[in-house]
Amino acid sequence: MKEYRVYLERARSRQQDFLYPLIFREYIYGLAYSHNFNRSIFVENGGYDNKYSLLNVKRLITRMYQQNHLIISANDSNKNPFLGYNKNFYSQIISEGFAIVVEIPFFLQLSSSLEEAEIIKSYKNLRSIHSVFPFLEDKFTYLNYVSDIRIPYPIHLEILVQILRYWVKDVPFFHLLRLFLYHFCNWNCFIPTKKSISTFSKSNPRLFLFLYNFYVCEYESIFLFLRNKSYHLRLKSFSVFFERIFFYAKREHLVEVFSKDFSYTLPFFKDPNIHYVRYQGKCILASKNVPFLMNKWKYYFIHLWQCFFDVWSQPRTININQLSEHSFQLLGYFSNVRLNRSVVRSQMLQNTFLIEIVSKKLDIIVPIIPLIRSLAKAKFCNVLGHPISKPVWADSSDFDIIERFLRICRNLSHYYNGSSKKKSLYRIKYILRLSCIKTLACKHKSTVRAFLKRSGSEELLEEFFTEEEEILSLIFPRDSFTLHRFHRNRIWYLDILFSNDLVNDE
């Protein structure tokens, strides 16, 4: 945030709050490269970071300055001098630059709102996505119905650009952004296909995620306004979800604009026990009341997307289920409410009674099948979960191979330590351990048994299972009972800023 403030102040001294000049500054692309290089991920990234160089950036900026090169022919985009022979590479650099520039004013607004709320010290802890699960454990055990909602993608990227125009008043910047989107990313057709959306999101992830998250923020601002108008008890805990950038100003703006139209509490949405949780493009709506009110919210979402955002959504895509009978998926976990029944003997005078007590507990389970499917896609095992070697890593040293497998295993263990049942997590560790051994045996052109016999013993890769115990022993007393208890219980971490990349939440 400090770097953003410095760069924006430097631009203000020259161009009166315009974002357009920042596109032609070399340090913006250096900042984008630094952000990608330092991002903590679970699977190694083979993106354009290794190809980044200041010479490429200077060459790109020089071509952008020459306005005649910005007149693009859609039929001749592969030979355009603006992109040269590295169309995809330059396109990715430009998209990273756009994302950095357009994020600057919103990061500044976010930092100022944090300073006003006096919660800077706890900001990093509150950013952890694991902080969502204690909320679920505390609230969802008292609820009966859950609605699993997938927020639809906009039919055209122009909708996202139009939404962004309400917040950033810089016409030249949006002209250049549209030029980039329509000609470099194949968005010049009236209705882009699902394949083109997927291609753009993979080749330009940062810019796409920013535009998509901004679209979600717009939808949630309207949802929050109507939710607050439907209850006598106003919502107070929404501010901890900091991904809703510039949320306070938007909420005040909505209250000011629509106060005349909604001057009384909406009677048809009254539900004092409704909870809403979202991460990325998926949200969970849970309630204690009958499904009738949940259906009202369901059709409200559908009409909101269709009327305000021109996004088509089918009612069958939103399911309403009982929490005790169905599970929902969020942040790479499967969650459901389990009923625990216990019998208590009670005695009054000479009479004895048996009382059955039913309590609810939120079960959060590791999704073993999607994880095995992701491991199979990454060539660590087959579709049945049988470990296989990874020959593409055989050129590395033994230490590097072991370190790569350990890094993935460590991050998976770190992320899924909050699960109710750890057996699935141990199975994933077992797959990675055997895959590592088979990769080393393949490198040395030997069988697994001969390699382990030559190496000394099967304790060669014991770090896969002992490292977590060593970390816990540094935090808690070195007591076997204590460590065993923490291995069985859930452990949520406050430094998880990204979801597990091996679970594709689609």
Curated annotation (Swiss-Prot):
Record keywords: Chloroplast, mRNA processing, Plastid, RNA-binding, tRNA processing
Coiled coil: none
Keyword tRNA processing: yes
GO molecular function: RNA binding
UniProt name for this protein: Maturase K
Similarity comment text for this entry: Belongs to the intron maturase 2 family. MatK subfamily.
Positions of disulphide bridges: none
Recorded GO CC terms: chloroplast
Function as written in the Swiss-Prot or TrEMBL entry: Usually encoded in the trnK tRNA gene intron. Probably assists in splicing its own and other chloroplast group II introns.
PANTHER family for the chain: MATURASE K (PTHR34811:SF1)
Domain of life where this protein originates: Eukaryota
Entry-linked Pfam families: Intron_maturas2, MatK_N
